[in-house]
Amino acid sequence: MDRSGIEARYAEALEAFVRKVRDDEQVIAAILLGSLSYDKVWEKSDIDMKLIVHDQKLTRSFMCFTENGIAINAGIQTRDEFKRWVEKSASASFEHSYLLRGKILFTKDPSLEAVFATIRHVGERDRQHRLLQLGCFALGGLAKAEKWLYVKEDALYSAFWMIKLIDTLAQIEVVRHGEVPMREAVQQASALNPAFFRDVYEGLVGGSVDPAKARAALDRIVRFMEERELELFRPVLDYLKQEQDVRSLSEMADKLGTVVRLDAATLEPACGWLAERGHLAPFPAEAKATPKSRVRLEEPAYMLEDADGNVR
């Protein structure tokens, strides 16, 4: 079947399915998601959508339907659940990008249009915390790529880890520019920073890898992180500046993890990086495994350090 025939088949299936669910008195709205809402479909594509229903106790939050031989994957939420989901979808997150390209097919409740419209806004606080999260993820991947090259002396597997890391670096670049990273984040970032992504992405994916090439790519990635460190890890620095005291990783994770998912293990590479770069001073902090534990342990803690090496 040619391209036009495939697209017509999917359009017919969508129209038929929407016509049915619109007649269901329990369904308030239908939102088209995924490739059919913004991209091309092919014979192996499915249709993604979200059905918003009246408040009730649902036995399933997801169903796979079929129409004209095409699978329709539908997330099912009550009106209140949908509103909470939108509110919790932090700006620049995957959920945010997924919603951003969605399209309301119909709604029987005009207030849902206003809820959906809020998705277009990218909050500065969300953006900063998303950069922090991505920066932490990037440092974790970078450490693995460095280990495979410098410790295990395997340039090819080091390149494999760098290729996995490229998507995170691309998301960083996209979010830095006030945009929302999509599934095609590498293509978005390549338009914003062509030199870096040409050298690292195309260089690793498009050719053979040797130790010298892997080392050069790692050096470029390290510089990429160094040039952006104050922007990526700004929430950590701002928090410690405000506290003016030593704070443990657990305390920082509790404070900074309210917007995006951040636990102490995720945050540790960022604080370690900032300490190595002279921005933070490390201290051990007393800790216990459980509130009832009697054995005293230690966890990493940090305090802000000024340009002269003085803690403050």
Q: Model-derived features: where do they sit?
A:
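Helical scaffold of the NTase/Pol beta-like nucleotidyltransferase catalytic core
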Residues: 1-28, 269, 304-312
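Conserved NTP/Mg2+-binding pocket subregion across the NTase superfamily
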Residues: 2-6, 12, 67-154
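Generic non-transmembrane alpha-helix signal with a bias for helix starts/N-cap capping motifs
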Residues: 14-15, 58, 264-267
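Short alpha-helical functional segments enriched in proximate histidine and acidic residues
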Residues: 20, 45, 172
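Alpha-helix boundary recognition
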Residues: 22, 99-100, 275
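Catalytic metal-binding acidic patch
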Residues: 31-78
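Conserved nucleotidyltransferase catalytic core and NTase-mimicking acidic/glycine-rich helix/loop elements
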Residues: 126-286, 290-293, 297-298, 302-312
